[in-house]
Amino acid sequence: MKLLKMKSLYSCLLLILLLVVTSFTIPRGWHKNGTDPDSYHAGVEAGAGISSSKAGTIQSARGRITGYCSLVQSFKPGRYRNKKIRLSGYMRSSDVENYAGFFLRIDGEPTGGALAFDNMEDRPIKGTTGWTRYEITLSVSDNAREIVLGAILNGPGKIWFDNIHIDVIDEPTDKKGTIIYKGPVNLNFEE
């Protein structure tokens, strides 16, 4: 009986610790979005980051989920206009059933919708993975009005993401970040 009480106390303390460590408060500059955001918890988890004490996180909260959730940040194109940009960041996953990843979208005129978009659906993060660096590269056209970036979880599982950067890149690239050179390079593999 005493052992059962100790196990119950331990379980309660562990649950309290998890609730304290995982704060599903949306961080400044970010917002929660998606087709089924109420089926997920999203926010910040202390002590879970790759390079800092905190990491962004999205976690399914129900067994049956009919859509996705994303943690999103939007900003004006400003200095990125007419440039190629690269979103890079680190993500790890636990028990992701459908897919997860970063996404980058360039919205603009004339339609007001997406001029360019990549959500890694063609190279999804699935299952349980360690910290891995991912990249997305897109062109920001002259008629861009907004850049939207974030992390996405579609279906059951949990993801953590950290150390996200947006960089201007000089080399022409395709949407997956592969450099497209003006001519052949390093054909003898010496560079």
Task: Put a short name on every predicted segment.
Residues 2-13:
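Bacterial N-terminal signal peptides that target proteins for export
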Residues 12-21:
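Bacterial N-terminal signal peptides
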Residues 23-191:
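Extracellular and organelle-lumenal recognition/adhesion modules and their flexible linkers in secreted
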